[in-house]
Amino acid sequence: MILTPGAYLKCRRTACGKSHQDVVDVIETDPAMSQAERVEWLKMIEADMVAVRWSTIVALRQQFPFDLAVLERLSLIQDGTDLPEPRLCRICASSDTGPLGLAVPAWGWDAPDLCISCACAS
């Protein structure tokens, strides 16, 4: 099953070991929101319940690595565009951007859907 854009962001955040609180503690909102409200907002983003502004994507990417091209492709697929699914690790959702933001080389895959970082950790 293909990931939604929000599920992709959630997977990348958790692959980096960051909690909702870790991320929202350093993201400012306008208008200002409490930490609890920001946590709920991030959960809604990850559940694809709210639209995400470009400034939010930039702020999230400063907190954990993810591939903008993958996020865009998943968004287009979700909107009905007929595109092939991006190659993603089934555990950390790495593509060209690995679990720690490092490039995954062509030989960096243990299986078609499993990067060697996650294969070694299993």
Question: In which residue ranges do the predicted regions lie?
Answer:
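Cys/His-rich microdomains that often coordinate metals
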Residues: M49, I91, D96, A119-S122
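Cysteine-rich micro-motifs
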Residues: L100-S122
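Recognition helix of helix-turn-helix/homeodomain-like DNA-binding domains
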Residues: I27-V52
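Residues in the helix-turn-helix
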Residues: D22, W41, V70
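DNA major-groove recognition helix of helix-turn-helix/homeodomain DNA-binding modules
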Residues: V50-E72
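Short, charged recognition helix plus adjacent turn
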Residues: A69-G98, G108
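A short, Lys/Arg-rich alpha-helix, primarily the initiator
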Residues: M1-D22, V26
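Phosphate-coordinating loops and pocket residues in cytosolic domains that bind phosphorylated ligands
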Residues: D25, M44, R73-L76
